[in-house]
Amino acid sequence: MGEGAAGSWYVTRDEVERGSPSRRDGVGAAKEAELRATYCSFIRDVGLRLQLPQVTIATATLLCHRFYLRQSHAKNEWQTVATVCVFLASKIEDTPCPLQRVIIVAYETMYRKDCNAAHRIYQKEVLEKQKELILVGETLLLSTIRFDFNIQHPYEPLKLALKKLGIFQMEVKQVAVNLINDAIRTTLVVQFKPHYIAAGSLYLAAKFNNFRLPSDGKVWWHEFDVAPKQLQAVIQQMTELFMGRNPCSMGPAIRPPPTPSLMERQQVIRPPPTPTLMERQPIIRPLPTPTLMENQHITHSLGAVMRHTHSSIRSLSNNFDREASRSLPLNIPANRKSTVCPARNEGNQSLRMHMGHSNGSDARFEKQYSRGALKADHVYHVVSGQKDLHVTGIRDLVRQKRTFHEVGEHPAPIDKSDTKSWIRKRHGRNVIVFDTKSSSWKKQKL
């Protein structure tokens, strides 16, 4: 293994399996492979939690591989070395992360199954000790890799080859990238140069998808500048590593989000289903039949509105008008039936009789004014055969009659028949008086 040059980082398979520093310290090949897989998964998890790009994660993984090519697992804990590699890779790839954040995320990832231990990193003393340890580890890493930051990955050679060969099938591209991601987690990246791994990944991806690679007059692998013997070696090792595995199931550059739990699924807001043709048509439903209480409430409301709208001076009921019309004396012609306006509550307003109205006028008044709001205790309707009479005048005559019959402080009983005769003498005309307060209509001729 050469020293001090870029080619020194590429070793043979035999050197990796038998001549590593860990092997000299008693760490077996199987144990070292297990530790390698562990720190690769740890670097990936920390990088994803820090939201680092895949290139930065690949650089951190490659730095860790190179460190253990010259250092032993028995003397250097992988947790500290892997954290240092993430911190240094973030600076190399120009995606820097604060040291404190890297330490906290790495510590929480390391003790993800022990919440109490994971919270210890927030103690000031523990955090300061971890910072000192990572800074010392960074110095050791830099001296081990000889400050060689010339790190290349198979992604760029694969991208250029796909463009030159005119391969635009997404299935082939995705499988090739997945193969590269898994190859970076093995010792292939310290055995073969990036364009060799890119060529082997493209070949296996095309074979898996039954895709024929174009040649255009020359062999496709010439685009990668590889020799057939070396290409065959990398394809053989990749086939051994991934034998029995589905290349589509290999981890992509960024892991998909975890499957939501049952509670999370219930909280997902789903769009409403598209209505069918029958649902799109509006459904016309009949209005509910109002109950007896609702009918009474509607009638009461309408009556209140009518009473508010029309003046109380035209508030006689239709039934009252009809009964008054039927009670006319026989000697009055039918065409001279009068329509009487309602009396005002105030005593100074007179009630005039409208004579000679037609039947159409009576019907119009009956429709327009439904029920009155008279509040007088005793209501009289006066119909005269020859001319209009003043109700106020008649009331004044009655008062005079009562005054004449008073004896001392107590009024004497009044004879109604005597009162009628007295009014007839005073007025000198035939008068019909209707008393509306009694239960039955009373027609009296004075």
Swiss-Prot record:
Alphabetical keyword list: Cell cycle, Cell division, Cyclin
Transmembrane residue ranges: none
Annotated GO biological process: cell division; positive regulation of DNA-templated transcription, elongation; positive regulation of transcription by RNA polymerase II
Taxonomy, superkingdom: Eukaryota
Keyword Cell division: yes
Keyword Cell cycle: yes
GO cellular component: cyclin/CDK positive transcription elongation factor complex; nucleus
SUPFAM superfamilies on file: Cyclin-like (SSF47954)
UniProt-listed InterPro entries: Cyclin-like_dom (IPR013763), Cyclin-like_sf (IPR036915), Cyclin/Ssn8 (IPR043198), Cyclin_N (IPR006671)
GO molecular function: cyclin-dependent protein serine/threonine kinase activator activity
UniProt family annotation: Belongs to the cyclin family. Cyclin T subfamily.
PANTHER family xrefs: CYCLIN
Protein's recorded name: Cyclin-T1-1
Organism: Oryza sativa subsp. japonica (Rice)
